[in-house]
Amino acid sequence: MSSTECYGAPPHNYYQDWPTTHSYYPSVPSSYSPLNHHPADIWAAHPSNYIMGNGHVSPPATASGLSPPASRSSNSSAELPTGVTASQHNTYKWMHTKRSQRPAAPKKKVIDENGTNRTNFTTHQLTELEKEFHTAKYVNRTRRTEIASNLKLQEAQVKIWFQNRRMKEKKREKEKAFLARNTWESNSPTSSCSGEDVKNFK
């Protein structure tokens, strides 16, 4: 005995209010083949079969369960802002590295013990200045201008160098004189004759 015989089959009028199964599925022509048709094409041909309860048309789902995009070219062009290409749109902010240009380090000035700035002369400049000093310890303004132009220095730098060089030369002369005097005093006889030595000598 089947279940319908035990409990009794409901009358046929009970199912009259139910919609038939054909209303849930789109009407597909007999020549339909899933290999040569896209769900978007079917939806475009029969949009009324996919009307939802709120009145909006719902496109058919693809094999992955997602609605097919309307147009890739239109979506991509709508998402990109004006003046931005596709390659620029794919980059992110964290991919852009900002490199700040470091300013060039300023040249340090050599400060003397008394707080004045001291010029660092090159070897060539010092050699030429020493040659000029041995030629003439005092130079006039015209010669200072020529020396400064040849050595790419300022006239004031040449003037100060000659002043310092003359002071250095005087200091060396004083030291030489002091050493020479001490050497002569140490080598000179310092013994004195006593009174007894003088009597014995007589």
From Swiss-Prot:
<keyword id="KW-0238">DNA-binding</keyword>
<dbReference type="InterPro" id="IPR017970">
    <property type="entry name" value="Homeobox_CS"/>
</dbReference>
<feature type="compositionally biased region" description="Low complexity">
    <location>
        <begin position="63"/>
        <end position="81"/>
    </location>
</feature>
<keyword id="KW-0217">Developmental protein</keyword>
<feature type="compositionally biased region" description="Polar residues">
    <location>
        <begin position="183"/>
        <end position="194"/>
    </location>
</feature>
<keyword id="KW-0539">Nucleus</keyword>
<protein>
    <recommendedName>
        <fullName>Homeobox protein ceh-13</fullName>
    </recommendedName>
</protein>
<dbReference type="GO" id="GO:0043565">
    <property type="term" value="F:sequence-specific DNA binding"/>
</dbReference>
<feature type="region of interest" description="Disordered">
    <location>
        <begin position="166"/>
        <end position="202"/>
    </location>
</feature>
<dbReference type="GO" id="GO:0003700">
    <property type="term" value="F:DNA-binding transcription factor activity"/>
</dbReference>
<dbReference type="GO" id="GO:0005634">
    <property type="term" value="C:nucleus"/>
</dbReference>
<feature type="region of interest" description="Disordered">
    <location>
        <begin position="60"/>
        <end position="83"/>
    </location>
</feature>
<dbReference type="InterPro" id="IPR046327">
    <property type="entry name" value="HXA1/B1/D1"/>
</dbReference>
<dbReference type="Pfam" id="PF00046">
    <property type="entry name" value="Homeodomain"/>
</dbReference>
<feature type="DNA-binding region" description="Homeobox">
    <location>
        <begin position="114"/>
        <end position="173"/>
    </location>
</feature>
<dbReference type="GO" id="GO:0005737">
    <property type="term" value="C:cytoplasm"/>
</dbReference>
<dbReference type="InterPro" id="IPR009057">
    <property type="entry name" value="Homeodomain-like_sf"/>
</dbReference>
<dbReference type="GO" id="GO:0098609">
    <property type="term" value="P:cell-cell adhesion"/>
</dbReference>
<keyword id="KW-0371">Homeobox</keyword>
<dbReference type="InterPro" id="IPR020479">
    <property type="entry name" value="HD_metazoa"/>
</dbReference>
<dbReference type="GO" id="GO:0000981">
    <property type="term" value="F:DNA-binding transcription factor activity, RNA polymerase II-specific"/>
</dbReference>
<dbReference type="InterPro" id="IPR001356">
    <property type="entry name" value="HD"/>
</dbReference>
<dbReference type="GO" id="GO:0009792">
    <property type="term" value="P:embryo development ending in birth or egg hatching"/>
</dbReference>
